[in-house]
């Protein structure tokens, strides 16, 4: 066990870290082996082993090294980190990322590595675990300079937060954010800590290194307290941003539909330009996007909102799409840009579960006795199914799934069952309507957005359409009272599509 020395020069570091950890008992340290994270590892170890002495609540701690594969020394650094954790009795693991596979997709390798690193780290967090990084005050100064370079507003200039929540799911703490690099160096030398020097830290092609090596030393020499002043400025910007969120909260809640994340844009016309831009920005952040630029907000307004009434505008935002339908804006995964080609698939009823293509979920059929279950409504919705997609923090993957049910007549012995995606010809007669309509007209009447229409499974018995599952049922699919059984068809799908089914259920009830 490493002994504890509570000399006055170290007490400030212990106090700041202890204060940041209040209420958290399962910690995961992002440990690179560099000076900063080595200092934090050492402090956390001492607090863990001497919680009574430092009035710190007991906590569990483990460390993760992210192997980027950028440096030729990455394997050696991983071994070093393993040994440092071993002598402290801290569980340790390594995760690998490959920056070069995606380098052509994003020219900024620095940002790419950071994004991949956080994604992998978040995916490794277990229930109630929080992530710790060793960012300090000097890192905050660099972040502010980079924000200035990008022309950021108060949100960007607020820098890094000591306590942040990502995607409403992952907690990130930065216990050393109020500490200077000099404090950490002094601690490391006095404790005789061993750390690695990353050779890429001297490469001034990277923006942070350029600032750290070429720009900031002269500034610190001229104004020794510059980092403290910048930290205060960042906090003031953060306070202003929090206040703005508070003031806009009521307006924002009136505009957004939480069931599918869509935004009513008609009311935006009555607001001032700054308020309109602020609301659009908060809407995009609602999807865990990076801070949208001024130019991007303007493009959404001009190219999507203000496009012709009969147009179907699409604006790609990295891996997302911004689309307009009727009086709403939608954010969608980029893979929903195009409609699916017509697909026809046979369903062998020996298997009651049918896996749909294109990650559209699964269908499940269940024969029921008509005497035991006569539904009041041909549709039924059950939310909060205990099934989630995965642990990614992407907004379209973090949503729970929704189970949509519909009840139709059972197939006859000579009827083959198939699932079709895409458009079909001819007039359709659906429950709730007396006159026939083409499928396109039905989609329009039920308010189904164009990008979802080709993704809704159509259930056929032979050549006869029975139901667009969860949306409408045809007269040919109506339950026949003289039959002994009916079919319950369930579609397990992403909740992002829930709104169209809620609308169709309301339509049938009316």
From Swiss-Prot:
It is found in: Cytoplasm. SUPFAM superfamilies: Adenine nucleotide alpha hydrolases-like, MesJ substrate recognition domain-like, PheT/TilS domain. Pfam families: ATP_bind_3 (PF01171), TilS (PF09179), TilS_C (PF11734). One of its GO terms (cellular component) is cytoplasm. ATP binds at residues 32-37. GO terms for biological process: tRNA modification. GO terms for molecular function: ATP binding; tRNA(Ile)-lysidine synthase activity. It catalyses: cytidine(34) in tRNA(Ile2) + L-lysine + ATP = lysidine(34) in tRNA(Ile2) + AMP + diphosphate + H(+). It comes from the Bacteria. The keyword rRNA processing does not apply. It is an enzyme of class 6 (ligase). Its EC number is 6.3.4.19. Its main location: cytoplasm. Belongs to the tRNA(Ile)-lysidine synthase family. Ligates lysine onto the cytidine present at position 34 of the AUA codon-specific tRNA(Ile) that contains the anticodon CAU, in an ATP-dependent manner. Cytidine is converted to lysidine, thus changing the amino acid specificity of the tRNA from methionine to isoleucine. The N-terminal region contains the highly conserved SGGXDS motif, predicted to be a P-loop motif involved in ATP binding. This is tRNA(Ile)-lysidine synthase. It comes from Blochmanniella pennsylvanica (strain BPEN). The gene is tilS.
């Amino acid at each position: 066990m490493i002994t504890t020395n509570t000399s006055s020069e170290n007490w400030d570091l212990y106090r700041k870290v202890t204060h940041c950890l209040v209420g958290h008992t399962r910690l995961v340290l992002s440990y690179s082996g560099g000076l900063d994270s080595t200092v934090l590892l050492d402090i956390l170890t001492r607090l863990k082993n001497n919680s009574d002495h430092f009035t710190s609540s007991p906590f569990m701690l483990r460390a993760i090294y992210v192997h980027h594969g950028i440096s030729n020394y990455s394997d050696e650094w991983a071994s070093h980190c393993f040994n440092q954790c071993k002598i402290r009795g801290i569980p340790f693991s390594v995760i690998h990322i490959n920056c070069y596979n995606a380098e052509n997709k994003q020219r900024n390798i620095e940002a790419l590595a950071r994004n991949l690193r956080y994604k992998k780290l978040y995916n490794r967090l277990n229930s109630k675990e929080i992530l710790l990084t060793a960012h300090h005050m000097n890192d905050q100064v660099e972040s502010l300079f980079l924000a200035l370079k990008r022309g950021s507003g108060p949100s960007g200039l607020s820098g890094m937060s000591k306590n942040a929540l990502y995607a409403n799911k992952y907690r990130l703490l930065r216990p050393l954010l109020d500490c200077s690099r000099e404090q950490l160096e002094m601690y490391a030398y006095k404790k005789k800590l061993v750390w690695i020097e990353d050779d890429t830290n001297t490469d001034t092609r990277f923006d942070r290194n350029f600032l750290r090596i070429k720009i900031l030393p002269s500034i610190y020499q001229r104004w020794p307290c510059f980092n403290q002043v910048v930290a205060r400025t960042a906090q003031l910007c953060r306070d202003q941003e929090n206040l703005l969120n508070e003031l806009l909260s009521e307006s924002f809640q009136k505009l957004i539909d939480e069931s599918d994340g869509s935004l009513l844009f008609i009311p935006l016309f009555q607001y001032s330009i700054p308020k309109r831009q602020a609301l659009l920005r908060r809407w995009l952040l609602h999807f865990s996007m990076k801070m949208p630029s001024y130019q991007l907000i303007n493009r959404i307004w001009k190219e999507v909102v203000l496009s012709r009434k009969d147009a179907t505008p699409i604006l790609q935002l990295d891996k997302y799409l911004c689309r307009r339908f009727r009086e709403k804006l939608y954010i969608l995964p980029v893979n929903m840009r195009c409609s699916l080609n017509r697909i026809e698939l046979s369903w062998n009823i020996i298997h009651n579960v049918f896996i749909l293509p294109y990650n559209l979920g699964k269908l499940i059929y269940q024969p029921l006795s008509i005497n035991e279950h006569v539904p009041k409504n041909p549709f039924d919705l059950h939310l909060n199914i205990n099934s989630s997609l995965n642990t990614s923090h992407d907004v379209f993957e973090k949503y729970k799934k929704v189970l949509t049910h519909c009840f139709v007549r059972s197939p006859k012995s000579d009827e083959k069952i198939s699932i079709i995606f895409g458009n079909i010809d001819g007039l359709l007669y659906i429950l709730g309507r007396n006159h026939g309509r083409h499928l396109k007209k039905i989609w329009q009447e039920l308010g189904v957005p164009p990008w979802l229409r080709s993704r809704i499974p159509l259930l056929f018995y032979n050549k006869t359409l029975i139901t667009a599952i969860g949306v409408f049922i045809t007269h040919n699919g109506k339950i026949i009272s003289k039959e002994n059984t009916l079919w319950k068809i369930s579609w397990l799908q992403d909740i992002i599509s829930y709104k169209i089914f809620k609308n169709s259920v309301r339509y049938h009830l009316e």
